[in-house]
Regions:
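Secretory targeting signatures
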Residues: 1-67, 462
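Extracellular/periplasmic catalytic domains that process cell-envelope and extracellular macromolecules
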Residues: 73-77, 182-184, 205-206, 234-237, ...
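Sec/Tat-exported extracytoplasmic proteins
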Residues: 87-99, 180-184, 213-216, 220, ...
């Protein structure tokens, strides 16, 4: 019996120009006209299949994107916080981890250099051992990952001594970042050394960053230009959140360039951990007040801690709380990314039939905040707190680690937080209107990368 024989071929590997040769090689025809017809039919089918393969074969970019998504789905839910400050002690045990960040995460955060640190010996011995391979070779354009730690760091300003590392005369940034980790031990830290618009924008322009935290500003909250243009980019354009420290004095926060703009979460402080009673301590009429006194890592050793106070530490503690909330919701709803890029629809959580925006996070924080009960001494702070309108001094109220669970429950819609009393709503609506009015007209100058606090007025808020 005459028949037509054919074998399987990989059409994706066959150039279109050689189709005739392929068909000739793969078809073994008999003598009858029926066999000729069968051969032509099979040839037609093969040609059609080839065009389908070409039409539906994914390009390299599509394959790369799919591979990246698969890789990210193999890792845990995460959140990225960007403290902006003096520098950070990458050698301290507080920032150590057995976890190694996946390569796709490093790529997405723009990492240009990896510094394998020495983890034996004193702080000085470790630093000396790593000078040649790491510290002496860093530039302002480097974004550096430190394996064995939770830290990716950069120093775009290039000011001071050793880039990224907290210098012996500093220490502020190490404590600030320690406060973030205390609230969310699994936070990915994208640390930026500096306190300029350039430093803030280094974090704002990172798609994976969720929260930017700044703990510096003008002494007494005097109305001078600061980082407000850059934080506006981060929140309004990039859909992130910004936590900004109010001044440590009772001066109003509304005109403060760090805590005052309506797009920022302005944070005052109250003492809690090292004090027998809670005390309202700082800036009046903020968004919220958070824990002021904390036990935080030293900048010049590997395992020491110190107790310190200030809105400088209340602010990153709040950033860590937000990070914990985001990470929890992402894990619950299958969101393997971070940030609020256009690809994520501008949403900080973009999961399975579930999204959360920066506005919704702020609303949940405001609803969860609370005013101290009768166990709190209203006269023990820097000034007495009005029992009638505490919002004028504490904003929506106090926020600490106890707020995490109700915030998550409200956002995942398992337990809704009730509305705040009408007088609180009215008070904070007035606050928002004043901030929008003030910052809508000031500063009048166009956005400028070069805007920076005058050194005469700038101070860290501890």
């Amino acid at each position: 019996m005459n028949c037509t024989m054919f074998s399987y071929i990989d059409l994706t590997r066959v150039p279109q120009s050689s189709m005739a040769e392929v068909l000739e090689a793969e078809l073994v025809s008999g003598d009858s006209s029926g066999n000729v017809f069968a051969g032509l039919l099979i040839a037609s089918i093969l040609i059609s299949a080839l065009f389908l393969v070409i039409a539906y074969s994914p390009d390299e970019d599509t394959v790369s994107m799919a591979e990246s998504e698969n890789e990210s789905s193999d890792w845990r839910a995460f959140s990225v916080v960007a403290p902006i400050d003096t520098g950070i002690n990458v050698y301290h045990d507080h920032f150590r981890t057995n976890e190694t960040y996946p390569q796709w995460l490093l790529d997405d955060l723009g990492v240009t250099k990896v510094c394998d640190l020495t983890f034996n010996g004193t702080w000085q011995e470790r630093y000396d051992a790593d000078r040649t391979s790491c510290w002496d070779n860093l530039t302002t354009s480097d974004i550096v990952y430190f394996p064995g730690t939770k830290i990716i760091g950069t120093s775009p300003d290039g000011d001071g001594g050793i880039l990224i590392l907290d210098d012996p005369s500093d220490g502020h940034g190490t404590a600030v970042t320690g406060s973030v980790i205390d609230a969310n031990p699994e936070a990915v830290i994208f640390f930026v050394e500096g306190f300029s618009d350039t430093a803030v924008l280094a974090a704002a322009n990172q798609p994976l960053v969720d929260v930017i935290s700044t703990s510096f500003g003008a002494i007494g909250s005097i109305p001078v230009p600061g980082i407000e243009d850059a934080t506006k980019v981060a929140v309004v354009e990039k859909n992130k959140l910004h936590t900004g420290a109010a001044d440590n004095s009772p001066s109003p926060a509304i005109q403060d360039a760090t805590a005052g703009p309506p797009w920022s979460i302005g944070i005052a402080g109250y003492a809690e951990e090292g004090d027998d009673q809670k005390e309202i301590m700082s800036g009046s009429y903020p968004d919220i007040s958070a824990d002021w006194t904390q036990y935080l890592p030293n900048h010049d050793d590997i395992d020491g801690y110190h107790e310190t106070s200030g809105t400088s530490f209340a602010t990153p503690r709040t950033a860590g709380i937000i990070s914990f909330v985001l990470q929890n919701l992402r894990g619950e709803f299958g969101d393997n990314g971070s940030g609020a890029s256009e690809e994520r629809g501008g949403m900080l959580v973009s999961g399975d039939n579930f999204t959360v925006s920066n506005t919704q996070i702020r609303e949940a924080i405001n609803l969860s905040a609370w005013y101290p009960d009768f166990g709190w001494d209203p006269t023990s702070g820097t000034m007495p707190i009005s029992p009638v309108m505490p919002c004028t001094q504490t904003g929506w109220g106090l926020v600490n680690l106890s707020n995490i669970e109700p915030i998550i429950a409200h956002l995942n819609q398992s337990t809704s937080l009730g509305d705040r009393p009408s007088d609180v709503e009215a008070c904070m609506s007035a606050n928002q209107e004043m901030r929008e009015s003030y910052w809508g007209a000031y500063p009048s100058a166009e956005y400028s990368i070069g805007a920076i606090f005058n050194e005469e007025y700038a101070t860290w808020r501890d």
